[in-house]
């Protein structure tokens, strides 16, 4: 699962860079949780459902 979480974090980091978006803004808009990206960076592994939700948000807002 760790490799999946790392890949997911990489996707999020790429989105942040491509859209020049602050991590806190992304966290609030995508998950309604201000510390979401910080928690990912800290090593928390999201559930498959959470990753699906965030990927859908990125697709709709990309």
Residue ranges with predicted function:
Residues 1-17:
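A short, Lys/Arg-rich alpha-helix, primarily the initiator
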Residues 21-36:
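Short alpha-helical DNA-recognition segment
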